[in-house]
Amino acid sequence: LFAIKPLLSKHEVKDGFDHLAFGKLPVLLGGRIKPLDSVARNSLLQIAGQQRIALEGNGPDKEWGDLYELSKKADGTGLTYQSFSQKFHKRPKKLHPTQWLMEVMMEPDVADKRFIFQINHPELLTELQLENVGVDKSGLRFYTFEQMQPFVMLLHKKKQVIGQKDAAERNPYERAAFKLAHALELYIQLRYSLQ
């Protein structure tokens, strides 16, 4: 039975890239050898707080489609992942962590348009003037790297100042700003890792 399993578990390659095989490639990270799939999953969890990226959702007029295209039509406002009533009959296309990592490394211009950066603190949203844009998912807000890029240096400086405080002494705003800055730095490291 174990000899037959590999023959039965062949997967079909779509879109020219075998993301499952890519995910099995070993990399040295933090002094340990890990498969790229683990790097992708852990990175996506740190950045987005989830392991898969929804590619589709609702526009302001409840039009269903590609989130980035809907964002362009509506100036980034009024986007949601899916309403409760849609949960039972609309399943958004989602990007597997390894597919996302391949995009980040090989097609960064495409990856920069994915809504992965989570910001939930109202004061931070107001400071960055992002409260009316992004994608809403049950009260959580997600943004693209394109939307976050103007704030990279500001958040990096904030992280340096906040990092001097003990983690237990940080207020919710500082924790949110620190986490967002870390997510942006991690994304940038991944984005330029093959260059």
Q: Language-model features: where?
A:
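...captures the hydrophobic TM-helix bundle architecture rather than a specific catalytic motif
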Residues: 1-3
